[in-house]
């Protein structure tokens, strides 16, 4: 049995006024009008602060995709059957999924974690087995996870990240029904109306969305006492989200740059931030998805997304698409010339 108190590491405040000033000065002195690179400059500043460097280098970036099934999916909250979870895990590993293609394109090492899929997988490179159970319990009938299962999943996420190289972690997930868990976590931890947090997920029609919202209202009411972050996580699930919570906490403790994908990955950061309030300092929001709850969640975290492409896929696909922007931000700091070095006159010269 894993004690939840032992699974939550201390996360320090990385604010460094002196380093921030040096980074800003370096950016201001590049051969360009002041602020002309817009949000690429604020991104460079954030990465520099996370890595504690005036010349940050992103090394061995890791794409971590956590997968699990949800008991709540039996209530018809998704347009797809639960079998799609294991089928997509196979697709990830075969190189046929969007995140597989994009990770390969951008040089991101892909690791897929079975956190609780209702299927046995053959061992192979790129697959890590950390299965808690064959899917969570139905949250409409009781807690999705026990407290012990929740703590073990968080511990698993920390363990997986400890074994990965590099200083950047990109978050991905797969689990039919997990947009429901994300909506429930957002409503409870941010104090928002569940209907506004709930979208069509994998493509529900209007009737399906109305049914999903009704189910989630009932689930939220059933677990009215689950107000603390770990209690809410155990009540709503899922195993992949809890494993990502652990991954985020470990990456934050190690001062890795954490690249958040869509709604579900962001829900894991929401829980981690509720547990340790300096987590979001290490995070970059890759994009704002078409799920209505995602923009609300990012606003709650105080994060501004880099892209808005109407994505609603998950997997880590948005993080992979945003990755070149992070690399460009670092190169601006490291390689772009200053006015003095280039012999270029300033505006006020």
Curated annotation (Swiss-Prot):
InterPro entries: Nict_dMeBzImd_PRibTrfase (IPR003200), Nict_dMeBzImd_PRibTrfase_bact (IPR017846), Nict_dMeBzImd_PRibTrfase_N (IPR023195), Nict_dMeBzImd_PRibTrfase_sf (IPR036087)
EC number: 2.4.2.21
Active site: 315 (proton acceptor)
UniProt protein name: Nicotinate-nucleotide--dimethylbenzimidazole phosphoribosyltransferase
Associated pathway: Nucleoside biosynthesis; alpha-ribazole biosynthesis; alpha-ribazole from 5,6-dimethylbenzimidazole: step 1/2
Gene: cobT
Enzymatic reactions: 5,6-dimethylbenzimidazole + nicotinate beta-D-ribonucleotide = alpha-ribazole 5'-phosphate + nicotinate + H(+)
Summary of the function given for this chain in its UniProt record: Catalyzes the synthesis of alpha-ribazole-5'-phosphate from nicotinate mononucleotide (NAMN) and 5,6-dimethylbenzimidazole (DMB).
Keywords tagged on the record: Cobalamin biosynthesis, Glycosyltransferase, Transferase
GO BP term, example: cobalamin biosynthetic process
Pfam hit, one: DBI_PRT
Alphabetized GO MF terms: nicotinate-nucleotide-dimethylbenzimidazole phosphoribosyltransferase activity
Organism lineage string: Bacteria, Pseudomonadati, Pseudomonadota, Betaproteobacteria, Burkholderiales
Family classification: Belongs to the CobT family.
